[in-house]
């Protein structure tokens, strides 16, 4: 298909067309993927004799941009700019047609052999008593939704839509931010979705980043910001309403046409994003009805928030502002005007909120745990024990200790988790308190951390996950006796109670990790901002991204042609291995430094 779009009758033998030669294509690819600024590239080509000796058809960066814009086919939809009016103010939102984005991912030839089109049940034994959960199609959500869809329109193929959003800094100063929204589909296996280089995520939109400082009342400002967020996403996701309920014909990379139903399945974001999306108040759980004062309990019963009650409260908007505010308060949400998920078919936003290993565990509970241990055992003692750790190939050494670290990343917290239990194993606590409960609490939390990240879960490992969390709760009172905590009413601690259910619904946590979103910020927000002149930047960022995607697509086509147009062998998926082995990887040409 792409070859037919890019082909030219006069250049049938030139696989690099619209570029005249291989060297011209390589220079263009370098300039757009690896090169410096457009001004520097123009200065290079303006050197006397450079473009002539290389045989280039373009003389500067502008001519190269025109060649890419007009001659290379559009692989993914172009961005559109539209104004959204909230509280009497107009805001620009840059977005793509979500249906075309889904078709682009669904029809990508690189994913053709990997796509899954129907839910499956996997078992670890012949008696089918121990069920396995890994990719999204092995979860119960796909099964349940497929049954509901078949009851209305039999024979449809579900395309689970995974949306993630996160505001990010694009500069180290001046407080310049971008608000990207990313899209991927659950039909693509998680082993591809977690690789940024696979292109399995699409930048769907840039949302407005305005703080609405012209609104002096803080409560009104927060409400206006929430309404702006939902108004923008409602405009971006609006096509899913009819496409999800009625279905649309979509062609996969192997040429097969199916009636597909793109359905909003899950939302990936940190705690502030989850609250903004669901409309729940700060300190409460965005998924269930547990009160803020009970989030530290492991025994308080809970139920997912009742979507029908929330929708009834939102419908009270037509009854006047006072009735609307009271109805929303009774339903436990903020008064949001028409949230984006209100009319989406088969969508339940409270069920769609997924676990967040990065922010809930590493940057949440583990961060709290390290602070508690530092206060219980003494910062000087913790740092001294860190310095005395022997060198190890698989453990990072913090030679200056860990209590003085600032802006600790999730990766650094993961490294600390590898040895923190070992360095406190014989620690002495104040007031001659026995350290047994402290060690059991730390072990329970660490066990939960590692079990939550299994690439494949079974009914048995999910039971072990619950036991690890129970072990922490049974021994957490040691921190109260030490005077470190008064309570454990932490929303991130309560969120751990939902991991079991969410893994059964949507597969393991590596299906929806916010680490992928954080990594995408580099390629699709920060790098894009650096290519602009920092004035009216989003127009330039979207244009730069479109050109980059065209170059990447043409690169795949050229590589396919050079390989002789060979077809890939059939792909047979299998559950991730449940055994975890340590492997020593040696360099091909070792040096004394590499093996010491």
Put a short name on every predicted segment.
Residues 24-32, 214-224, 400-406, 505-509, ...:
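Short interface patches used for recognition in eukaryotic signaling and trafficking proteins
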Residues 164-211:
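Acidic, metal-ligating active-site segments
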Residues 63, 69-150, 363-596:
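Terminal interaction-prone segments of large eukaryotic proteins
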Residues 57-62, 245-262, 433-441:
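Short, glycine/acidic-rich hinge or "gate" loops at secondary-structure transitions
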Residues 1-79:
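N-terminal regions that are enriched for targeting/export leaders
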Residues 18-26, 204-219, 395-400, 444-449:
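Surface-exposed beta-strand-to-loop junctions
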Residues 94, 102, 109-111, 116-163, ...:
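Charged (Asp/Glu and Lys/Arg) segments that form or flank catalytic channels of large polymer-
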Residues 174-178, 194-198, 218-219, 297-301, ...:
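Short coil/turn segments at secondary-structure boundaries
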């Amino acid at each position: 298909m792409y070859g037919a779009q890019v082909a030219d009758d006069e250049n049938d033998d030139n696989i690099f067309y619209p570029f005249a030669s291989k060297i011209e294509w390589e220079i263009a690819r370098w300039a757009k993927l690896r090169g410096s600024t457009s001004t520097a590239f123009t200065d290079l080509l303006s050197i006397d004799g450079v473009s002539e000796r290389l045989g280039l058809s373009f003389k500067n960066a502008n001519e190269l941009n025109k060649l890419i814009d007009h001659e290379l086919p559009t692989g993914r939809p172009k961005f559109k700019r539209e104004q959204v009016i909230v509280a009497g103010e107009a805001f620009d939102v840059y977005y793509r047609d979500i249906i075309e984005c889904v078709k682009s991912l669904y029809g990508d030839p690189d994913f053709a052999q990997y796509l899954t089109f129907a839910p499956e049940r996997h078992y670890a034994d012949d008696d089918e008593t121990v069920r396995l959960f890994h990719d999204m199609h092995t979860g119960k959500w796909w099964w349940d939704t497929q049954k509901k869809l078949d009851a209305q329109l039999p024979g449809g193929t579900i395309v689970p839509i995974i949306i993630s959003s996160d505001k990010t800094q694009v500069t180290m100063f001046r407080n310049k931010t971008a608000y990207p929204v990313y899209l991927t589909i659950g039909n693509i296996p998680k082993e591809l979705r977690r690789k940024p280089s696979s292109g399995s995520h699409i930048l769907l939109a840039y949302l407005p980043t305005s703080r609405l400082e012209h609104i002096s009342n803080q409560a009104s400002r927060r409400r206006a910001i929430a309404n702006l967020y939902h108004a923008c996403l409602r405009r971006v996701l609006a096509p899913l309403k009819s496409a999800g309920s009625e279905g649309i014909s979509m062609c996969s990379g192997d040429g097969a046409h199916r009636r597909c139903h793109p359905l909003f399945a899950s939302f990936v974001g940190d705690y502030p994003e989850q609250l903004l999306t669901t409309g729940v108040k700060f300190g409460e759980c965005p998924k269930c009805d547990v009160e803020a004062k009970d989030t530290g309990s492991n025994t308080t019963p809970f139920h997912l928030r009742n979507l029908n009650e929330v929708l009834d409260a939102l419908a009270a908007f037509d009854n006047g502002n006072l009735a609307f505010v009271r109805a929303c308060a009774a339903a436990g949400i903020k008064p949001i005007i028409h949230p984006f998920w209100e009319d989406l078919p088969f969508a339940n936003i409270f069920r769609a909120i997924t676990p967040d290993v990065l922010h809930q565990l590493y940057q949440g509970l583990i961060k709290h745990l390290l602070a508690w241990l530092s206060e219980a055992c003494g910062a000087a003692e913790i740092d001294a024990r860190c310095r005395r750790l022997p060198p190890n190939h698989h453990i990072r050494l913090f030679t200056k200790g860990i209590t003085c670290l600032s802006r600790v990343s999730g990766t650094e917290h993961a490294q600390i988790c590898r040895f923190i239990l070992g360095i406190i194993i014989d620690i002495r606590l104040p007031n001659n308190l026995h350290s047994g409960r402290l060690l059991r609490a730390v072990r329970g939390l660490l066990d939960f951390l590692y079990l939550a990240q299994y690439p494949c879960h079974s009914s048995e490992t999910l039971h072990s996950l619950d036991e690890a969390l129970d072990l922490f709760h049974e021994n957490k009172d040691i921190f109260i006796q030490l005077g470190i905590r008064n309570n454990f009413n932490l929303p991130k601690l309560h969120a751990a109670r939902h991991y079991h259910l969410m893994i059964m619904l949507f597969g393991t946590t590596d299906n929806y990790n916010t680490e992928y979103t954080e990594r995408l910020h580099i390629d699709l927000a920060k790098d894009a901002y650096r290519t602009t002149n920092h004035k009216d930047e989003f127009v330039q960022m979207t244009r730069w991204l479109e050109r980059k995607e065209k170059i990447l697509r043409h690169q795949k086509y050229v590589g396919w042609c050079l390989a002789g147009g060979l077809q890939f062998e059939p792909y047979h998926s299998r559950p991730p291995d449940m055994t975890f082995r340590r492997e020593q990887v040696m360099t091909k040409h070792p040096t004394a430094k590499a093996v010491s």
